[in-house]
């Protein structure tokens, strides 16, 4: 069953379909990882699409170097990062928000970008 009807209304400078029910209490979260060494110029399309689909009540977490979570030898850097993600989850569960500094820290590289690229390229 569709969540919205064919009817439209203008909200700000855009049009959106009228919902079949009141979904204003819902919150939306995107957690997106990638295999690149940083968040710049890698997540923008996914973030833009998510914001178009869910223009209000959204939280976005981006995690570069995410394949490292599958490498046991990277635990020295991935376990502390996973602890930050769990902390963010606790904040979100309690208040519906995540501290901006915490989001920034989660989105930062776990190791230097050049080192990550060298590992991926088989240079280490």
What are the functions of these language-model segments?
Residues 40, 54-124:
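Glycine-rich phosphate/pyrophosphate-binding loop and the adjoining helix
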Residues 1-56:
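Helix-loop-strand module that forms the ligand-binding subsite of alpha/beta enzymes
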């Amino acid at each position: 069953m569709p969540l919205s009807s064919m009817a439209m209304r203008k909200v700000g400078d855009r049009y959106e379909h009228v919902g079949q029910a009141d979904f204003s209490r819902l919150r939306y979260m995107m957690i997106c990882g990638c295999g690149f060494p940083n968040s710049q110029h890698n997540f923008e399309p996914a973030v833009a699409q998510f914001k178009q689909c869910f223009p209000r009540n959204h939280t976005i977490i981006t995690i570069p170097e995410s394949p490292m979570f599958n490498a046991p030898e990277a635990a020295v850097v991935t376990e502390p990062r996973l602890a930050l993600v769990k902390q963010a989850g606790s904040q979100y569960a309690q208040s519906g928000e995540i501290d901006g500094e915490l989001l920034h820290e989660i989105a930062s590289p776990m190791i230097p970008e050049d080192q990550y690229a060298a590992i991926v390229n088989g240079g280490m």
